[in-house]
Amino acid sequence: MPLHYEVHGPADGEAVLLSSGLGGSAAFWQPQLGALLEAGHRVIAYDQRGTGRSPAALDAGYAIADMARDVVQILDATATPRCHLVGHALGGLVGLQLALDEPARVASLVLVNAWSKPNAHSARCFDARLALLDACGPRAYVEAQPIFLYPAAWCAEHAQRVADEVDHAFAHFPGEANMRARIGALRAFDIDARLGAITAPTLVAAAMDDALVPWTCSQRLADGLKDVTLHFLPHGGHAHSVTEAAVFNRSLLDFLARVSAPGVPA
C-alpha cells in the first residue's frame, strides 16, 4: 500500500523530513511546520505505515528497519536525494536506523526524546499501556496517552485540547494488532553498539521531566554519537516539541542553519 505524505515549501529548499512517534501522524508536527517553511525549508511529513492515512495490516515482526525503508520510499517518490530527518521518539529511532542503513540519504538528524537501546523504565510504561489495551480496550489506552506525553500542569491548563486529542486518537486508532506491532518494534530496537558508526551531525533534544523516556537515554545518544549538539529542557514532557514549541523551534532552526550546506540542496 502507498504511504500518505505531504510536501510543503519551495522545491529548492533544504529538505526536512518529519517522522512522528508512536502515533505515526504527520499532524504531530503542526507546531513546527510554519517555522520551517518561514525559514525556507522544503518539508516532507507522512503518516507512518499502519496509521492514519497510510492504512496497512502490520506483521508481528514489523521492525524499525522496515520503517526506515518506508522513508527511503518517500525520499525516492519525492525525488529527494537526502534530507535532514527530524524524529520524535520512535521517529528518532527510524532516523538512527536510516543513518546506519542509508547514510548518503541523511544530511543530519534531530532526535527528540529518543534512545539507542531499551531501558527498564520505558519497558514498564509500555507494559502498563499494553495491559490497559488488553484489559480495557482502545478507549482506555488513548485516555491514558496524555499522561505519558505531557506534564501534568500542561494537561490541566490545556484540558479541552487534551480532550479533543484523545477523541481524535480514538477515532483514528490504528487497531490493536497494529499498535502491538509498533510497540514491539520500538521495544526491540537496539543499535547502541553501532552509535559510533553514525557520522551525520545530530541534534539530540530532550526534556528532563519526560515521564516515558528518561533524559539519560538522550545523554547516552550524545555520548555515543560522533557529531552532536545536545539540548536539554528542564520541563516539557515527552512531547516537548508541542508543549515548548517556541523553544524547541529555535533550537531546531539554529541547528539546521548551521548544518545546511549553502548552495547544496538536501
UniProtKB/Swiss-Prot annotation:
GO terms under cellular component: membrane
EC number(s) from the headed UniProt entry: 3.5.1.-
Gene Ontology biological-process annotations: acylglycerol catabolic process; nitrogen utilization; uracil catabolic process
UniProt GO molecular function: hydrolase activity, acting on carbon-nitrogen (but not peptide) bonds, in linear amides; monoacylglycerol lipase activity
Protein name in UniProt: Putative carbamate hydrolase RutD
Keyword line: Hydrolase
Root EC class: hydrolase
Residue ranges annotated for the AB hydrolase-1 domain, each copy included: 15-128
Reactions catalysed: carbamate + 2 H(+) = NH4(+) + CO2
Family: Belongs to the AB hydrolase superfamily. Hydrolase RutD family.
Highest taxon above the source species: Bacteria
Record-linked InterPro entries: AB_hydrolase_1, AB_hydrolase_fold, AB_hydrolase_sf, Pyrimidine_utilisation_RutD
Function: Involved in pyrimidine catabolism. May facilitate the hydrolysis of carbamate, a reaction that can also occur spontaneously.
Pfam families from the UniProt entry: Abhydrolase_1
